[in-house]
């Protein structure tokens, strides 16, 4: 069975790993299906294609369910309600991404405000276990977004060629954006 999560019906303009995904998994179990084939679950790049990704390892943050963030206390009911997009036969990528990006940023801030104990331990362990790709990815995304996601070879030459001083400066300049990207991958 080939179904990408973005194809699930949902109220947020694009399918995600929320209730509709759970319903689909239940359906697969009830019908004794043993394989669920998906397109890549990585962040989409140009043209919103899952085959044009910025990473082979990262998860697409737009698959994070606002309803699950509500359950975790990272979004309020009114905030998730404001994300609702009237149903359509096509995905309104730009509108869905715009609304979800703002909500994910807010949820991330709440996550960091309350971070401590076991959750902090799990978060730090996640960063350590995935550091071989995650550290470069979060920096790339933070710098990339500041460059309107233009190709990296059009960025400032020092950061594009990974000069140590430019990397250090970028880590300070984009500290908040980097924190957001770490959380997005942890939450995914």
For the regions a language model picked out, list residue spans one by one:
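Acidic/aromatic-lined carbohydrate-recognition and catalytic surfaces
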Residues: 1-188
